[in-house]
C-alpha cells in the first residue's frame, strides 16, 4: 500500500481517538448517558420494552444494541426485551410501499409500542424524516423518547425526553461515539438488572 493510503488509515484512527477522548470527558454526554441508562432500566424493570430505530449505519447500531440487551453484554443473565425495528424486511417494504419510507418506523411504533416502553431513535444528522416521525408517534403513544445524534442534530431534541449528542459533526465519528456510549449504557443496564436478580 502507498504511503498516501496508509496515512488515510492512520489519520482516521487518530481522529477517532481524539473524538473518543472528547466524548469521555464531555460532561453533558456522560450525564445524558446516565439518564438514558436509568430510563431504560426503569422501563425494563416495569416489564416494558426498548424499541430502537435508525437508518443505514445507525440501523446496524440499532440491531447491535438490541442484540446486547436481548442476548447479553458480558454477564450470563435473563434476556431483556429489546427490538430493532430495522430488521423485518416484509414490514419495512410493505409499509414503505403503502405509506412511504418516511413512515417505516412510525407505523411499527404504532403497532408495537405501548405506554411505558422506550424508543431509542438514532440519527447522526437529527433530520431523518423516518426517525422524526417515529419519535412523534412514540410521543403520541406515551413512550419515553430517547435520541442519539451529532452536533448538527440538536433540533431532534424537541421530540426527545433525553438527547445524547456525540461531540462531532463527522458521521463515522458520530457513529463510533454512539456505539461506544451504547456499550457503556448496556453495561450499566446489565449491572443494575443483575443486582435485582440477586
Swiss-Prot record:
Span of domain SIS: 40-198
Family: Belongs to the SIS family. GmhA subfamily.
Organism, scientific name: Bradyrhizobium sp. (strain ORS 278)
Cofactor binding notes: Binds 1 zinc ion per subunit.
Protein name: Phosphoheptose isomerase
Stored InterPro entries: GmhA/DiaA, Phosphoheptose_Isoase, SIS_dom, SIS_dom_sf, SIS_GmhA/DiaA_subfam
PROSITE patterns named in the record: SIS
Membrane-spanning segments: none
GO biological process: carbohydrate metabolic process; D-glycero-D-manno-heptose 7-phosphate biosynthetic process
Subcellular location: Cytoplasm
Enzyme class: isomerase
Further remarks about this protein from its record: The reaction produces a racemic mixture of D-glycero-alpha-D-manno-heptose 7-phosphate and D-glycero-beta-D-manno-heptose 7-phosphate.
Pfam family, one: SIS_2
Cytoplasm recorded as keyword: yes
Functional pathway: Carbohydrate biosynthesis; D-glycero-D-manno-heptose 7-phosphate biosynthesis; D-glycero-alpha-D-manno-heptose 7-phosphate and D-glycero-beta-D-manno-heptose 7-phosphate from sedoheptulose 7-phosphate: step 1/1
Catalyzed reactions per annotation: 2 D-sedoheptulose 7-phosphate = D-glycero-alpha-D-manno-heptose 7-phosphate + D-glycero-beta-D-manno-heptose 7-phosphate
Residues reported in the UniProt entry to bind substrate: 55-57, 68, 97-98, 123-125, 128, 175
A GO cellular-component term linked to this record: cytoplasm
Amino acid at each position: 500500500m502507498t504511503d498516501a493510503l496508509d496515512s488515510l488509515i492512520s489519520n482516521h484512527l487518530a481522529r477517532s481517538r481524539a473524538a473518543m477522548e472528547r466524548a469521555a470527558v464531555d460532561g453533558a454526554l456522560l450525564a445524558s448517558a446516565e439518564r438514558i441508562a436509568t430510563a431504560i432500566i426503569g422501563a425494563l424493570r416495569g416489564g416494558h420494552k426498548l424499541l430502537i430505530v435508525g437508518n443505514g449505519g445507525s440501523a446496524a447500531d440499532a440491531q447491535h444494541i438490541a442484540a446486547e440487551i436481548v442476548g447479553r453484554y458480558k454477564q450470563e443473565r435473563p434476556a431483556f426485551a429489546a427490538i430493532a425495528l430495522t430488521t423485518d424486511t416484509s414490514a419495512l417494504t410493505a409499509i414503505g410501499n403503502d405509506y412511504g419510507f418516511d413512515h417505516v418506523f412510525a407505523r411499527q411504533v404504532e403497532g408495537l409500542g405501548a405506554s411505558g416502553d422506550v424508543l431509542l431513535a438514532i440519527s447522526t444528522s437529527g433530520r431523518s424524516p423516518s426517525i422524526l416521525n417515529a419519535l412523534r408517534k412514540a410521543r403520541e403513544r406515551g413512550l419515553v423518547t430517547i435520541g442519539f445524534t451529532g452536533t448538527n442534530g440538536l433540533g431532534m431534541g424537541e421530540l426527545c425526553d433525553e438527547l445524547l449528542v456525540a461531540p462531532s459533526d463527522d458521521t463515522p465519528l458520530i457513529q463510533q461515539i454512539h456505539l461506544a456510549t451504547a456499550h457503556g449504557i448496556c453495561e450499566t443496564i446489565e449491572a443494575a438488572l443483575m443486582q435485582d436478580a440477586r
